[in-house]
């Protein structure tokens, strides 16, 4: 089957579902009222400590790898970028509007004029206000992609490879130093970094074998587990422990990319097709948008699922896993409902409003024909 993105590969669609589950698992601990690094070290403590960073960073890397794999071999235009951003903005508008209504219903007298002023700004300008950092970075990346793609292709294999090595040295090797930032993180720089690496692999290198993918995955997982166990045993200050663990688990770190790339290659090699998986995977982004919308996020992790309520329970790990899956199921169902409403209304002529607006601008600004 051609990997043109037109026919969804169920292996990668299943990986999207796994990615968003990992992100929700990370948020359950990261947004909780417990500092898991300050708890007595045991198997349960290790489990929650491992959830604190790594799963979420693996999840966003998987989301990005799946997207850029197909974008690397597609023509990129400014018009195409704006169209994708337009379609994405409608979903952001929906979730922000739903959150605004929920806030007014749950606490009609509790909203100050200051809070409501920000709520309206968030409603219409979610990208510029960075409500969802991943979506904002992705939108910026799409706008830059035509220029990045053209220049990478013009570089050729040798110069592209040198660029990869420089990036790996700056952000993979030096990134292991505790406290290092190097201007990369939850921003578009990470997106460009991953695109440069994955495009080089797609254009110039042979595909790795399943055995190699398993080895890469195992190495990445082993490094993270060993780092957490070893550092927890020798460092007893919670703040210092976080500082030394983070370089191994933060976004775009070597272990995170090893795990993500290994999983990506393993699931990409899956040949089977499933309409059910493909359908459910359409809600993966929606699950992320719902659970990370600021108001819904606060409700989820401070009122609905409070880690401190069951952390000391005998079956805390089981409760955590059940709550993660339950949140994903509910959020996924809500997004499928949103998708159904869109099909009845906005998507009856998908992109028609954008095309009309673009054509109107085209009639007034002729230079847009080059985009």
Question: What is each residue range found by the language model?
Answer:
Residues 1-371:
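Alpha-helical transmembrane segments and their immediate juxtamembrane cytosolic regions
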